Amino acid sequence: MAVKYDLTQTLLPYLDRHLGLPLLSHLAGSGIFSETDIAKAQYELAKNTSMVDYALQLYEQAYPNQPAPAEIEKQRENAIALNDKLGSEVDHVLEVIQDPSVASALKQDKAQNLQWLEEKYNLTSEQINALYRYGYFQFSCGNYGDASSYLYHFRVLSTDPVLTMSSHWGKLASDILVGEWEQALSELKLLREQLDSSAAHVTASYAQPSTSNGSSQNDDLTQEGLLKKRAWLLHWALFIFFNHPGGREQLVEMFLSPVYLNTIQTTCWWLLRYVVAALLLSRRTTRVYLVQQPAPATLMASVSGANVNKLSPQQAIKDIVNIIDSESYRIAGTDPIVDFLSKLFVDFDFEAAQEQLTLAEQVASKDFFLADFKDELVEACRVVISEAYCRIHSKVDIADLVKRLNLSKEDGEKWIVNLVRDTRADAKIDFKEGMVFMNPTHPPVYQTIIEKTRGFTFRTSAMGTAIDRKAHPPSLNNTHNLNGNDKRGNAGGRGGRGGQRNQGGQRDRSHAHNNEAKREGESASAEEAQQQQPAQAIAAN
C-alpha cells in the first residue's frame, strides 16, 4: 500500500539532485523500499556532484565488497584542481566586495556600478562571473552556506540576466538545504516575481509580429518554458511551506492563485495532496486566505501589483473540492488524502471517507513533507467529518459518530466534548441517551449576499480591461511599462481616447464636455472649425 501512494519517484524529476537526497534519506527509514535499493538511488544522484567522499560512502553501501570505481578518484582530483583554480579567480573579487567602502558606494544601477568598479578597482564582468562559477562549485561540493553567500554577491553585481536568474535558483536551493527558511521564503518570492516578469515578456512577444524567421526562442520566453519553471517552483516551495511557521497558509495562497493552479492541473496534479493537507491544517487558524489574481493591466500574476481575492476557509474548501471533482478522471483512487475530501464533500459518503481517513493516516506517516504533521492532519480530518455530519443531522448518535472518527468510545466522547467547547457550537450533549442535539443555525442574509457578490468587482474590472485591450492591442513598450507611465489613453497619447486622467487613473471627461458646450455657444470661423474638428472627433469617442 505504501509503495502505491509514495510520491518520491514522481517528485524527483522536478527537483535538483541535492534536494532529492533528503527525500531518499527519509525513505531509508520508512521501510517502503530496501535500504540497498535506496543507497543505489542515492549514489546515482550523488555521483555527478563534487561530493566525492559522500558518493564513495554511498557506493560502499550500495555495492558492498566491491572496489570503488576509478572515476571517483579521478573526480576527486578534478574537484581539488577546480577548487584551486576558481578560488584564485575570485580572490580579487572577494577582496573588493568585502571592503565596507565599496558596499556603501554601490548604487541601484548595476551598469553604473560595473563601470565604477572597472575604473577604480579594475574589476571586469568576467571576474564577476567567476564568482557565479565558484558559488555553483561550492553548491556542488555540498557547501550550501558558502554557495548562498557567493551567489547573492554575484547577483548584486551582475548585469547578465540569464546568470542572474540561474543564481536565484541556486540560492533558493542553498537556503533550503541549510534550513534558512526566512531567507528561502524571501528568495521564493523574488524568483516568483522574476517568472511573472518573464510572463510579461511572453505576452508582449506574442502580441508582436514574428521576426525570428522560424528560429527557436529563449526557453524563458515561451509558454512551455514558463510552465516548466513554475512546476519546478511549486515542488521546491514544498520544502519551505512545510517548515516555515506560517508556511501552510502561504502554500494555500500560492497554490490556489490562478497561474499556479493552472500549472498544477496541467502538469503536476499530484500536488493536490499537499494543497488539501495544507488547507485542512490551516483552516482553523486562518480567517482568510489572500489569493493573488492576475493583474488585468499586464496580463500577469505580478506579486507586487496583483489583485488580491480574499477567500474564507469554507470557500477555499469549496474551490478545491470543485477542482478535485473536475480532475477525478485521473486522480480518483490515487491519493487517500485527496480522496478523503472527495468522498466527504462530493459523494457525501461517510463510510468511504472513514476508510480514506485510515489510509490517509498511513500515507501521511510515510510522506517526507507530511510526516511531522500526521497527528494534526488526522485531527483536522476528524473535525471536518464531524462538522459535515452534524450539519446534516439535528440529532447525532454519539456511538455512530465515534465509529466514523476511528476512535474508542471513551476517547470519542472526550473528543466530542472538546469539539463542542472549542467551536462554541450550539449543541447539547446527553450522555444518558448517547445523543448530541444540534440547534440549526443559518448565516445572516447580509453575509450570504457578500459571499455571492464577492467576485463582482474583479470580474467587472477584468471585463472592462479586456474590452479596452481589444480596442488597443498591447505593444512591447506599453506591456513592460510597469511604473505607471503608460501614455496610452492620455490626452494626446498615441492610440488614446483623449481626456485627462484624474488621480485614480480614470479618464476625466468633464473637461472634454465643457469644451464641447463652450464651442456650441460660440460661433467659430471656418478656419477655427477645421482646427477643432479633430479634437471633437477624439472627445466624441
From Swiss-Prot:
InterPro entries documented for this protein: eIF3e, eIF3e_N, PCI_dom, WH_DNA-bd_sf
Compositionally biased tracts (Basic and acidic residues): 506-522
Pfam families assigned to the protein according to its UniProt record, in alphabetical order: eIF3_N, PCI
GO CC, one annotated term: eukaryotic 43S preinitiation complex
Keywords assigned: Cytoplasm, Initiation factor, Protein biosynthesis
Keyword Protein biosynthesis: yes
Principal subcellular localisation of the protein: cytoplasm
Residue stretches of biased makeup (Low complexity): 523-541
Gene Ontology terms, MF aspect: translation initiation factor activity
Superkingdom of this protein's organism: Eukaryota
Subcellular localization, as worded in the UniProt entry: Cytoplasm
Secreted is among the record's keywords: no
Segments for region (Disordered): 466-541
A GO biological process held by the record: formation of cytoplasmic translation initiation complex
Domain PCI: 252-443
Positions with biased composition (Gly residues): 490-502
Job of this protein: Component of the eukaryotic translation initiation factor 3 (eIF-3) complex, which is involved in protein synthesis of a specialized repertoire of mRNAs and, together with other initiation factors, stimulates binding of mRNA and methionyl-tRNAi to the 40S ribosome. The eIF-3 complex specifically targets and initiates translation of a subset of mRNAs involved in cell proliferation.
Record's subunit section: Component of the eukaryotic translation initiation factor 3 (eIF-3) complex.
Sequence similarity: Belongs to the eIF-3 subunit E family.
Descriptive protein name: Eukaryotic translation initiation factor 3 subunit E
Gene coding for it: INT6
